[in-house]
């Protein structure tokens, strides 16, 4: 890979901290959106990269934040040259990444992990299904990138010899970027879904990890607090900046609180009858009843579960509807029988990211 003039001449600022968003940082339209960028997903990398957006400090090759997120991903993972080392130009050298396994620090670790994955899945594709963004080039761009990974395990990996199996599963990466550097990321690789599709028993892999934990695990209380509070507002946007009518922040926080901490009545009130859910460990289902059962299974295992919303941002407006990204965290004690085998009495930390669409409700639904 030949370094561009931008790469040769850029000055990087170390040790950035992610600033929380406010209501004014949310895009009120869809001019810069994945739907328009991909022409309603009819193309993956378009000829026209879309409207020019202020991107101070970013490589001028990128037109807007959607273009940046989609094309750096494609360049790293899928081009003929497969420029894995380009990660060093779009992740800060001291980047902080919270993932399935714990806390990863620095772009070199990301580069190493990516080489491992591309060797295990030489035909890998990372197909963007949605990108929700907010922010700007002063406070930072916050992006929630929903990607479907597709590939065939024809290479050796940390899970053993090549299995020859085809995989397809969702990944969500919530990033904060300034001046061409992603410096904070909360990413859920959905490792359990990948393992199941590869024919690897997730329980056996969990036992192996317990005896030989990877870097960043177990997660300390300090790291857990950092995971929850990084980029989070000290006070919810809906409390610090009240608005009349529908408020995506208030809606998302109320919905999560009701579903996970209370009686779950919001499922019937706000979810479509045939809504589609896809989540961790290859969970795929549709409809309110299936979702209610999923929530019941989790709460049965962790009867004292308490969930809190850490960050909400969104795109949209009342006429076109809303795209909402919500990052949450929860704590509970493994006290119940069920999907996680015999209760251990251990305190557990759970976190996740959720992307969903919401039409504007009627006044009588608020």
At which residue positions do the language-model features occur?
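Single conserved hydrophobic/aromatic residue that forms the stacking wall/gate
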Residues: 356-359, 363-366
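Short, low-complexity N-terminal intrinsically disordered segments enriched in polar/charged residues
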Residues: 2-76, 81, 203-261, 269
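Short, solvent-exposed aromatic-acidic interface loops
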Residues: 186-196, 362
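Short, cysteine-centered beta-strand-loop-beta hairpins and adjacent loop/turn segments enriched
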Residues: 150-165, 331-346
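A solvent-exposed, acidic/Ser-Thr-rich amphipathic alpha-helical stretch
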Residues: 64-71, 82-151, 264-333
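Hydrophobic/aromatic beta-strand elements that line small-molecule binding cavities or substrate pockets
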Residues: 129-133, 170-175, 309-314, 351-356
């Amino acid at each position: 890979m030949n370094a561009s003039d931008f790469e040769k001449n850029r000055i990087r600022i170390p040790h950035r901290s992610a600033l929380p968003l406010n209501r004014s940082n949310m895009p009120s339209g869809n001019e810069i959106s994945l739907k328009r960028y991909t022409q309603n997903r009819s193309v993956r990398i378009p000829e026209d990269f879309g409207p020019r957006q202020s991107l101070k400090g970013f490589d001028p090759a990128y037109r807007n934040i959607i273009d940046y997120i989609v094309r750096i991903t494609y360049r790293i993972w899928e081009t003929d040259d497969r420029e894995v080392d380009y990660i060093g130009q779009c992740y800060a050298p001291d980047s902080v990444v919270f993932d399935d396994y714990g806390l990863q620090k620095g772009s070199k670790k990301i580069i190493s992990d990516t080489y491992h994955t591309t060797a295990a899945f030489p035909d890998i594709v990372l197909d963007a299904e949605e990108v929700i963004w907010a922010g700007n080039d002063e406070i930072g761009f916050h992006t929630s990138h929903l990607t479907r990974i597709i590939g065939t395990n024809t290479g050796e990996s940390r899970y053993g010899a090549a299995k020859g199996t085809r995989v397809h599963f969702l990944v969500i990466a919530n990033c904060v970027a300034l001046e061409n550097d992603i410096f904070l990321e909360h990413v859920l690789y959905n490792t359990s879904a990948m393992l199941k599709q590869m024919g690897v028993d997730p329980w056996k892999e969990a036992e192996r990890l317990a005896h030989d934990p990877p870097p960043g695990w177990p997660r300390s209380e300090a790291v857990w607090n950092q995971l929850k509070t990084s980029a989070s507002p000290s006070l919810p946007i809906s409390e610090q900046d009240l608005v009349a009518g529908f408020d995506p922040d208030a809606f998302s926080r109320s919905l999560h609180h009701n579903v996970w901490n209370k009686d779950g009545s919001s499922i019937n009130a706000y979810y479509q009858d045939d809504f589609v859910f896809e989540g961790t460990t290859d969970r795929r289902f549709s409809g309110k009843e299936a979702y209610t059962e999923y929530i019941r299974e989790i709460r049965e295992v962790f009867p004292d579960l308490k969930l809190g919303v850490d960050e909400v941002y969104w795109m949209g407006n009342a006429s076109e509807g809303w795209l909402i990204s919500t990052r949450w965290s929860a704590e509970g004690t493994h006290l119940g029988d069920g999907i996680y085998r015999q209760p251990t009495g251990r305190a557990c930390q759970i976190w996740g990211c959720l992307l969903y669409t919401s039409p504007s409700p009627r006044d009588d639904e608020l």
